Design a protein with these regions (language model features):
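Long, intrinsically disordered, low-complexity segments
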Residues: 20-21, 117-120, 192-194, 215, ...
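Membrane-proximal, proline-rich intrinsically disordered regions
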Residues: 20-74, 103, 249-250, 525-539
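Flexible, polar/acidic helix-loop-strand segments at domain edges
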Residues: 90-102, 351-431
């Protein structure tokens, strides 16, 4: 795998876009040497931003670590939970509160997520300033292309910030002053992201980002097209500035300008999904190959976090966090015996019936665990048997407190992994074409069209029978196909299911208003910038 250039760059880090200013370590290198030619400007002002896509620090990275974006999009849903197992996994009520939607503005992990997202946004603004101030060393084409790529990265991070926090500040200048910073409505942030991506997409390389080479791990045109499809699919949500009043626009009445044509949200989503098909993406014949140790040549994966245990410190925690201690030990490392699938999730896969979905064994460890064809034995001499249907949010008094719940699978085990299985060679899949097909199917159905071709292409790939293309089946298929990929919260919100009761979760008082579909603005940010208003329901 190609190395993504590492760098240390002096930069005032304006966390929360407030007077809270931290400074990154000062670089001892001569600034003029760092930016003395086009190659160095690209490495240190553009490529350097990709250092932050993944991480080995809690609450940082778009995926791979714990207590961050992925956990708040997965462990707050009917897909998965991190149950209390006696003396393990209470953690001050963190995981139980996450599952029960009992977070608040003082949640330190939400604050850390906010800091992470805006750190990269601030650094992107700095990079744009650097490119502009050194454009005499660049050709007009280089200035255009470098600027476009940085703006696309910034839009990507604004997308995650908007999706989680709704009303966030739009700041595009590196030298902004506190009195200039205001909080934008969610619809304004949505429009900003769409406009940015549509504006820069023609300047982005029309290359496959997941493949090794010059564009490996970068935001290319297909990445922008996928993100635009995702934005259009969720336009009803993102254009709603008061998500607690029970009203929102219909996607058929939300319009985009797409290549000079006026299209509604669903037509826009379909158009961008079709662009991905034209760009050469297709389903892999083997579903599991997208998550193999060496998955960098997948024809289906669109955007990934490149991992290489010999080059990067970035980590993938989810297998390590989920497997029983003895299970991890059988691979020569360790594990934390934590997260697992909810009962409703394994039942959706048909577990316990004669009609188990063919993706079940790829996505989960269940029943008697075998490694290299051999059973794993617990300290009491009994074989390790995961019990998917015995899961409870608090297992402290359960006979199965150590073994309840089907565990995270999906990614092939890297048998040469470092750090107890957290540093691996499997690239982390963020965007893939299988999701695009399901988005296209959903958009067609919502637009009054037939989405059966796209929906059943997904099922054909794994040898499952065709189903009718309706919204219920599409939501279920998104769980079956995309489990453990970090999309469930967004899907449940879009389908109006996120605030309802499921798997030992009772809705909070007033949660029917939808206030928990957006996380609170961290209190530290409110304290530092009095112009900010708290999100609805958390006042």
């Amino acid at each position: 795998m190609n190395t993504i250039i590492k760098y240390i760059l002096a930069a005032p880090l304006m966390l929360c876009f407030s007077s809270c200013l931290d400074e990154l370590p000062k670089d001892q290198l001569d600034q003029e040497a760092i930016y003395n030619n086009a190659d160095n400007i690209y490495k240190n002002a553009v490529a350097s931003l990709y250092n932050y896509i993944g991480s080995n620090q809690e609450s940082e990275g778009l995926q791979g670590t714990c207590r961050g974006i992925y956990d708040y999009n997965t462990l707050t849903t009917d897909e998965a939970m991190n149950p209390i197992r006696g003396g393990d996994w209470y953690d001050g009520g963190l995981w139980e509160n996450m599952y029960q939607h009992k977070w608040n503005a003082n949640d330190i992990n939400l604050y850390n997520v906010w800091k992470y997202l805006f750190k990269v946004i601030v650094l992107s603004n700095q990079s744009l300033s650097i490119i502009d101030s050194h454009k005499t060393l660049l050709s007009a084409e280089q200035t255009r292309d470098f600027t476009a790529e940085v703006r696309a990265v910034r839009a990507l991070f604004y997308y995650y910030a908007m999706d989680m926090f709704g009303r966030v500040p739009i700041v595009t200048s590196y030298d902004v002053k506190l009195e200039q910073v205001t909080q934008s409505e969610r619809s304004e942030v949505f429009k900003f992201i769409v406009d940015e991506l549509q504006d820069v997409a023609p300047q982005l390389a029309d290359e496959h980002s997941n493949k090794e080479g010059d564009y490996y791990g970068r935001v290319t045109r297909p990445v922008a097209n996928f993100l635009l499809a995702k934005l259009a699919l969720n336009a009803e949500i993102y254009t709603d500035d008061n998500w607690t009043d029970g009203k929102r626009q219909d996607g058929k009445s939300i319009y985009f300008n797409v290549n000079g044509e006026k299209k509604n949200a669903w037509e826009t989503c379909i158009w961008y999904c079709e662009q991905l098909r034209q760009e050469g993406y297709e389903l892999e014949s083997d579903y599991a190959s997208n998550f193999a140790v060496h998955n960098e040549n997948s024809k289906e994966n669109i955007f990934t976090i490149p991992l290489d245990k010999n080059l990067y410190l970035n980590e993938y925690h989810y297998l390590f966090r989920s497997r029983h201690y003895k299970h991890g030990g059988a691979y020569g490392g360790s594990s934390e015996n934590g997260t697992c699938a909810t009962v409703s999730t394994v039942k959706a896969f048909g577990y316990g019936t004669d009609n188990v979905d063919n993706r079940f064994k790829i996505n989960f460890y269940a029943d008697t665990v075998l490694v290299d064809g051999k059973k794993i034995y617990l300290d009491n001499g009994k074989p390790l048997v995961y019990m998917p249907l015995e899961l409870k949010l608090n297992l402290s008094n359960s006979t199965y407190k150590q073994t309840a719940g089907a565990r995270v699978g999906k990614y092939e085990v890297d048998r040469t992994a470092y750090s107890d299985g957290r540093q691996v060679d499997n690239d982390i899949v963020l965007f893939r074409y299988g999701d695009a097909l399901l988005m296209e199917a959903e958009a067609k159905v919502r637009n009054g069209e037939d989405g059966s071709i796209e929906l059943n292409a997904i099922r054909d790939r794994v040898g499952m029978p065709h189903v009718e293309a309706n919204l219920d089946n599409i939501l279920k298929e998104r769980l079956l196909e995309l489990v453990w990929e970090g999309w469930r919260r967004q899907d449940l919100i879009r389908f109006g299911e996120y605030t309802k009761a499921y798997d030992q979760r009772t809705p909070l008082e007033k949660e029917s208003t939808g206030f928990t579909t957006v996380f609170p603005i961290p209190q530290r940010c409110l304290d530092l910038n009095k112009k900010y208003k708290q999100n609805y329901g958390y006042e």
